[in-house]
Amino acid sequence: LGVHIPHGTTIFPGTGSPACAAWPTVIKPVRSKVALHDETLSLSVRICANATQRDEALADLLPLSPVLEQDYFRGRGFGVEVLFEHGEPRWWFAHERIHELPITGGASSYRRSIDVPGNLRKATLDLLVHLRWHGVAMVEFKMSDDGDYRLMEINPRLWGSLPLAVASGVNFPLAML
């Protein structure tokens, strides 16, 4: 499809971990929340600058969840939110992440609505049409200043920045009725 993605591999508990190809590397738990005994734990993305940090991240996370290890891509975070009906786009919205926690990349804590960048619109359209998507999705990207981008993930659900879309006049929940 020509959609750019960071190189990555999934590491499962008890399988050992392959050697890291480049630094920094990103360790993403497959699950953001896990139940442990009587509590719910939040798992977060770790950006590792060296083997020691990577080993610590894997030791912390692998007992709780498989992880995705990806090459780090420097850029700003963007979300392209869509509502598709039987493989056809009906509603579009986009936001830029102004601030993330941690600041080097993670959950967004401050965003602004933007016009959907052309290259991200094309990548989103190519992906979701190919998948014959039906319903909502938030397609997350990182984009460098020169317009090069990487797909980070597709969230097949309503997203944390939904209130920004609604406040901007793009009411996805109403459109889903």
Predicted segments with their positions:
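Active-site ExK catalytic segment of metal-dependent nucleases
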Residues: 28, 153-155
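Active-site "cap" helix and flanking loop/linker of ATP-utilizing ligase/carboxylase catalytic domains
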Residues: 115-139, 145, 156-177
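A conserved helix-loop-beta module that forms one wall/lid of the active-site cleft
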Residues: 1-45
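Short secondary-structure junction motifs
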Residues: 5, 66, 134-138
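Phosphate-binding site of ATP-dependent enzymes
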Residues: 46-103, 112-125, 142-150, 158
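Short acidic/His/Gly/Ser-rich catalytic and metal-binding motifs that mark active-site loops
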Residues: 34-37, 100-104
